[in-house]
Amino acid sequence: LARTLLGKRVVLYRTLAGQAVALEDRCAHRSFPLSRSRLEGDGIVCGYHGFRYDSQGELIETPSQKACPRGVGIRHYPLLERGPLVWIWLGDPRLADPKRLPQRPWLEYPGWACSKGYF
């Protein structure tokens, strides 16, 4: 799922275990949109040259090389699921503080209905 949030291109997906992932929506090699690529296991494979990234944005495979270049990857954005909402932090990851998120306990009440989707 591709979204532009606060001017940043982000690709969102879920791992096989259902964990939500948010990564920068571009391959580190040629900036090909990873949202136009494919998921394999818990990672994403660039549709241009096949670079494979894990769910943390680390480059874990390059088809044309035996070893991956060190320090190459894409930005991983911290996120948190609370009820039916997914909160993403686009700033400095060291400053992400889940305690600052607004509390919305009624969103999880059994008699409460929520509309889902992108608004």
Question: What are the language-model segments listed below?
Answer:
Residues 27, 46:
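Short cysteine-rich clusters marking metal-coordination/redox-active sites
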Residues 31-36:
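Conserved HGGG/HGGXW glycine-rich cap/lid loop of the alpha/beta-hydrolase fold
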Residues 24:
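A glycine-rich beta-to-alpha transition motif near the start of alpha/beta enzyme domains, typified by
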Residues 15-16, 28-30:
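Short, solvent-exposed loop/edge-beta patches enriched in aromatic
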Residues 30, 50-52:
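Detector for the c-type heme attachment site
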Residues 1-20, 40-41, 52-119:
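Rieske [2Fe-2S] iron-sulfur-binding subdomain
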